[in-house]
Amino acid sequence: MQNHKFSRHLLKSLYLSCCYEEIKVNKPGNVSVKSPKYGMNYRKFYRAAEISSKYIINKDYNVCESIYFACKNCLKELGSNYNLGIILMITPIIKTASEDFNSILDLRVKLKKKLNAINSQNTNLIKEAIKISNPGGIHNYSGTGNIMKSTENKLNFREMIKISSYWDRISKSYMNSYREIFECGLPFFFNSKKQFSRKFSIERLFIYYMSIGQDSHILRKYNKEKAISVSYKAKKILNHLKKENKYTEEKLINFDKYLKFKNLNPGTCADLTVTTLLIDKITDIVSISNLKKN
């Protein structure tokens, strides 16, 4: 079986291309080139990707260090949080893919080991990255495992994400080794690519993530009822996206206008979308490499 090990330069290129792709498509409620969100400049998302890439691919940093320095330097230049969720989701993948693996299944096994090892690393760096990034709605939570309270430092990172995984999809991804990506998003995107353009497939993927779970950002910022309502609306929209035409494009545009009017931003679904695009690109490269080898 062929071994794979992606260079840091290739991983940086793949990461940036995924961030750029995602910002160009219509993601209802979320920022895009053609539909900016009030107070958010899409060019800053480009810049956030460029800044964070330098620290994410740094071989001298472990997962915690890369996350912390990526967030810290993005905030230093941009002044606010533009990509905490993406950094949290992407960093373990890039660290794993930069080491030897022999298949996508093996990549997932080693990703699990990488995530489990975080507990023995300097997890306070990840906690600090989340604190300084101050993600939307995080101050609305006051229960056990509140990362914004210094009194919760007695909990290790694994214990904290176990608590938050009940409502936060990024924490859940850390707990179950990205099951939602590998077992839901990737197969859905793979099938979409067979039928539709890449642009429309990415838009469908974003709506799909909205439809299968409550968006963590909306849940934190508002409440469970609001998050469920948005997810229900996304399911109805997804049912209309079985063809790629002006009608479906109009459906997405109108849904985008509605969510932005209501100030409902499914930001976590955007993070899941970028992560899926990266793993999909890695999968494609591995598949092509195996074909050439055979």
Predicted features by range, described:
Residues 1-61, 98-257, 261-263, 280-294:
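Phosphate-rich cofactor/ligand-interacting catalytic cores and adjacent structured alpha/beta frameworks
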Residues 18-19, 64, 71-74, 184, ...:
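Generic recognition of cysteine residues
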